[in-house]
Amino acid sequence: MSMYERCQKVMPAVANRATTLGVVDGEGCYVITEDGRKVLDFASGVAVNNLGFKNPEVVQAIREQLDTMIHVGHNVVYNESYVKLAEKLVELTGGDTKVYFSNSGAEANDGAMKLAKYVTKRPGIIAFRNSFHGRTIGSLSITGSNSGYRKYYEPLMPAVYWADYNDLEQFDAIFEKLIAPECVAAIIVEPVQGEGGYVVPKPEFLKGLRKICDDHGIMLI
């Protein structure tokens, strides 16, 4: 019985998969299936793990970490890997910032919206059509790429307003007709829209969003 057939018996059909392949090994950009085939993975992994399979540097780093500790609660003690990564991210992003780690992008987005509302004391969030930010109730509320994600779960988080990606001129109308800028806690945007079609914005778009947010005391996520 294949992995796919076994999964049908014990796992609910809550997440679709692109194939029915069961894989047992991988190397570089290839995976080895349970029936011995070598299949090219054009993504070389997925999401934050698109580094290929068994990358020697990644494997060595994992081994070194296993030799010290597998996991420790960051809300209990500090550890070198946690602090070192935070320092590196601060360095790469200009130095005048701080870092907090989350389990997933959806949780990071939920946390960012909570923080923006807490700091600004404002209710509104502006998101972009065709965006994807996650499947929690909070991140689903700002996801505009597929109505199927939202089906059966509404009402979602209130005070979410939609804008078109790659368009700065619309914001005068949004602030005049939909929500005043002093009521907007944050604008959340993908630097490159993924599910919207891998849309790379015009160079001036993100800079323009930054200026709009700075001018009105809005957080940019």
Where in the sequence are the language-model features?
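Hydrophobic "anchor" residues on beta-strands that sit immediately upstream
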Residues: 37, 186, 218-221
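A short, flexible beta-alpha/helix-coil linker loop
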Residues: 45, 68-69, 168, 191-195
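PLP-dependent aspartate aminotransferase-fold enzymes
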Residues: 87-186
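Active-site-adjacent loop/helix segments that line or gate small-molecule/cofactor pockets in enzymes
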Residues: 1-27, 81-82
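Active-site and channel-lining beta-strand-loop segments
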Residues: 20-41
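Short acidic, glycine-rich surface-loop motifs adjacent to enzyme active sites
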Residues: 182-198
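Catalytic PLP-binding core of fold-type I/II PLP enzymes
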Residues: 181, 199-221
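Glycine-rich loop-to-alpha-helix module at the N-terminal edge of alpha/beta enzyme cores
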Residues: 9, 38-122, 126
